[in-house]
From Swiss-Prot:
One of its GO terms (biological process) is regulation of immune system process. The gene is PIP. Disulfide bonds join 65-91, 89-123. The keyword Cell membrane does not apply. This is Prolactin-inducible protein.
């Protein structure tokens, strides 16, 4: 019986080892990959009826590919190629950049939206994932007309 008690008694070294393993596991859980990384670039201000180019660069840290649909939404209707929607296969080794050219004569809020969707025929062999938690990502900028 005494031998059994010695086997189950935790030594300080064992407790320290368990603590270090627990801290290491928590740190590993914090290292999650980002689903979508986006950089939306438009001028801060333009003159009335000048052509504006909006650029959206999108990438992922996931190892799997995703089908993404990108588009712009504005607070007022805009002219030009503003309403174009792009669909692409986004993989960690193949970031994408999308361009829109449009005109405006009023200050406007513009949202660049990235939806992760389920669509066949976009990614090779239709091998793509859809995140469970989030499937819509966006960023909003203000374009001032002066």
């Amino acid at each position: 019986m005494r031998l059994l008690q010695l086997l189950f008694r935790a030594s300080p070294a064992t407790l320290l080892l368990v603590l270090c393993l627990q801290l290491g596991a928590n740190k590993a859980q914090d290292n999650t990959r980002k689903i979508i990384i986006k950089n939306f670039d438009i001028p801060k201000s333009v003159r009335p009826n000048d052509e504006v180019t909006a650029v959206l660069a999108v990438q992922t840290e996931l190892k799997e590919c995703m089908v993404v649909k990108t588009y712009l939404i504005s607070s007022i209707p805009l002219q030009g190629a503003f309403n174009y929607k792009y669909t692409a296969c986004l993989c960690d080794d193949n970031p994408k950049t999308f361009y829109w050219d449009f005109y405006t004569n009023r200050t406007v809020q513009i949202a660049a939206v990235v939806d992760v969707i389920r669509e066949l025929g976009i990614c090779p062999d239709d091998a793509a994932v859809i995140p469970i938690k989030n499937n819509r990502f966006y960023t909003i900028e203000i374009l001032k007309v002066e």
